[in-house]
């Protein structure tokens, strides 16, 4: 396996003890990755690395580019600041040593390919043998001679298509014949099953010590890297999705190239329209709040396939039917978000909280106190409304803070 020229390592590569000296010649990472590692054994290995670990910070323009691209793919909520910097460093090294002409600026659009077989139906599973249908049934089908003109006339006539009248004598004779035929068929089926079992044992599909390495490579969807200049070793699926959709090379912990990755889109289960804008809450086609996250597989050739879950809990309507509260007015009203174009109050701070005390300002007017007043008595202060410049909105300061949902009445 030819080593990659420049390899960017994520925290997962160090935690999994990947042989980076065999995977690449020049190993890069950022300092935040090393700070993330708290494992005692991993930090002990980092102290005595058998290769030179180079620290390099990505440029801000590449960080912005990767951030915008990850928002379009829907992986931005799953990425941390360190992950984005690792992606930006990979993009920067690719731009320096290879170029950016082959990289994609926009993610691939989802193409839904319809097939007769269910997408979740297993075809070739390593270690599992799916018995095929009996070939004896196909051999017993006799096509017979071609139909004559008289038969065609009979087929197109009215008497052929009318419901046949019941023939009791024929049915009684058929019952006597069926009893003998069933006994003969049971004996023949037992013989055929024994023959099929013998033939199935000789076939492939089983994991043996001789083919276990090949099956492991096939299950990982990996290839041996050839003529690869820059690659990123990561175990994060969100990072792998972004790298593959941008056209960058993704390396597994064992040094193999990853061919497939999984991304996500939003699909409306009301009108069945899809969108790659993961920031949407309401469907842009029907306007309902019926968008669900659907996984999409991205192959190495850029084709995408959607995978639907059979779990009934995914589309469980429980909790969707409830009485709406009475709409409230005022500057600080909190009403449920029902439509995309619904208007909400601005939730501005009080006049006292917006005052800035700057004694060196030319238009400063001395008041009772030269110090800034802390507003704690106004309605906005009680509701913990923040400044719009700092991201004011309809949410609590701490979304993880516990709050009482159900209060028992005494």
Swiss-Prot record:
Known function: May play a role in mRNA degradation. Endonuclease required for processing of 20S pre-rRNA precursor and biogenesis of 40S ribosomal subunits.
Subunit: May interact with UPF2. Component of the small ribosomal subunit, ribosomal RNA processing complex (SSU RRP complex).
Main localization (coarse): nucleus
UniProt family annotation: Belongs to the NOB1 family.
Annotated localization: Nucleus
Cellular compartments per GO CC: nucleus; preribosome, small subunit precursor
Source organism of the structure: Rattus norvegicus (Rat)
Record EC number: 3.1.-.-
Sites bearing Phosphoserine, chain numbering: 199, 323, 350
Keywords: Endonuclease, Hydrolase, Metal-binding, Nuclease, Nucleus, Phosphoprotein, Zinc, Zinc-finger
GO BP annotation list: maturation of SSU-rRNA; visual perception
Domain of life assignment: Eukaryota
Residue segments, region Disordered: 180-210
Ligand binding (Zn(2+)): 268, 271, 283, 286
PANTHER family documented for this protein: RNA-BINDING PROTEIN NOB1 (PTHR12814:SF2)
Annotated GO MF terms: RNA endonuclease activity; zinc ion binding
UniProt keyword annotation of Zinc-finger present: yes
UniProt xrefs under Pfam families: PIN_6, WRNPLPNID, Zn_ribbon_NOB1
Domain PINc: 5-108
NOB1 zinc-finger residues: 258-330
Composition skew (Acidic residues), residue ranges: 180-203
Protein name: RNA-binding protein NOB1
Record InterPro entries: NOB1 (IPR039907), Nob1_euk (IPR017117), NOB1_Zf-like_sf (IPR036283), NOB1_Zn-bd (IPR014881), PIN_dom (IPR002716), Ribonuclease_PIN (IPR033411), WRNPLPNID (IPR033461)
């Amino acid at each position: 396996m030819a080593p990659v020229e420049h390899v960017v390592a994520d925290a997962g590569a160090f935690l999994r003890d990947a042989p980076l000296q065999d995977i690449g010649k020049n190993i890069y990472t950022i300092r935040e990755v090393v700070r993330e590692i708290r494992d005692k054994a991993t930090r002990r290995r980092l102290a005595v690395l058998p290769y030179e670990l180079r620290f390099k910070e990505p440029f801000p323009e590449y960080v912005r580019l990767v951030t915008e691209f990850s928002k379009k793919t829907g992986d931005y909520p799953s990425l941390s600041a360190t992950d984005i910097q690792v992606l930006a460093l990979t993009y920067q090294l690719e731009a320096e040593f290879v170029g950016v002409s082959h990289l994609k600026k926009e993610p691939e659009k989802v193409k839904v390919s319809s097939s007769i077989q269910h997408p979740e139906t297993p075809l070739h599973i390593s270690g599992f043998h799916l018995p095929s249908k009996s070939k004896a049934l196909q051999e017993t089908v006799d096509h017979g001679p071609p139909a004559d003109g008289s038969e065609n006339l009979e087929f197109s006539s009215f008497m052929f298509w009318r419901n046949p009248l019941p023939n009791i004598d024929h049915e009684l004779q058929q019952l006597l014949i069926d009893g003998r035929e069933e006994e003969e068929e049971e004996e023949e089926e037992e013989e055929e099953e024994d023959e099929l079992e013998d033939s199935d044992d000789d076939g492939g599909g089983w994991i043996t010590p001789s083919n276990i390495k090949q099956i492991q490579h096939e299950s990982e969807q990996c290839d041996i890297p050839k003529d690869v200049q820059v690659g990123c070793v990561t175990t994060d699926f969100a990072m792998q999705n972004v790298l593959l959709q941008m056209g960058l090379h993704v390396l597994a912990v064992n040094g193999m190239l990853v061919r497939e990755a999984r991304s996500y889109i939003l699909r409306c289960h009301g009108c069945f329209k899809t969108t790659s804008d993961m920031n949407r809450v309401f469907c842009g086609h029907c306007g309902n709040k019926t968008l669900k996250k659907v996984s999409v597989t991205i192959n190495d050739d850029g084709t995408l396939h959607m995978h639907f879950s059979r779990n009934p809990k995914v589309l469980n309507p429980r909790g969707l039917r409830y009485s709406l509260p009475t709409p409230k007015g005022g500057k600080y009203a909190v009403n449920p978000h029902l439509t995309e174009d619904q208007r909400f109050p601005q939730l501005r701070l009080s006049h006292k909280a917006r005052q800035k005390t700057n004694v060196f300002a030319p238009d400063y007017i001395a008041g009772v106190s030269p110090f800034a007043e802390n507003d704690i008595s106004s309605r906005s202060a009680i509701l913990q409304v923040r400044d719009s410049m700092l991201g004011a909105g309809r949410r609590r300061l701490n979304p993880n803070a516990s709050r009482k949902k159900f209060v028992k009445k005494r």
